[in-house]
């Protein structure tokens, strides 16, 4: 029975793959400036500079769009934790170190642009936003595959494979979330901004996906262990956001990111790209874990069906409430006239 490769061995063996994918990334990426996506002429001073404080009526975004934008921004705000995580697992030497810093620099634009847009358009309470940012960054983040707990848990990815496989799914999930949030905003500038951000996330996903693919070819059993751990315990990095569960329900009900999207647009495309259920190089315990993963996919499908039913019932309840309110308003209006 062959021994698992150490992280140092994996880093060394995968270094040419990383360098190749960095070069490809640099030819595909597009330079852009956050300020080009902000409607500055819509802005005005807040109270401290002689203007007025934020008023909820100023926001032109729907509740779903507002909650999704807030959640996306707070997720981006935790970049210091993400940088720490990948630096710890990828190292800061050679091509790996170059990628860590390059990725961080590109990711940093996202939070800058989203915050500027929300503050200039007065789409969200700036005081609440800053309070949430402080709390979110103070909490930090460690990958969800280690079942991060609320409170003082201080858990990290256990291996290079844990980290690179997790961020593959996370980057794709973030891309999908940003893209669907742009559509939910129903506002041209916001949609263009989030298209630009999601394009960055897609290129980042491709980098991690292809490095992971090389890892599967190099040490399939070892990679399979990490894949099983990642997917069966997956949590988005926004998990640490205050009141995340309530926000997640709003986002899911609004069609921005729900169980069906997670399975069909995130999980399955990556598994198909890696040919997880077609490969014949998993042996022993890894083969068993692949079978368990297939069962997990079936469970995710069941969750999707249950969610779709619950969502439809919720929409029907909302429609009935709106119908009753409209009828009541009509009756009041008729009486007044």
Predicted features and spans:
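Non-heme di-metal
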Residues: 1-337
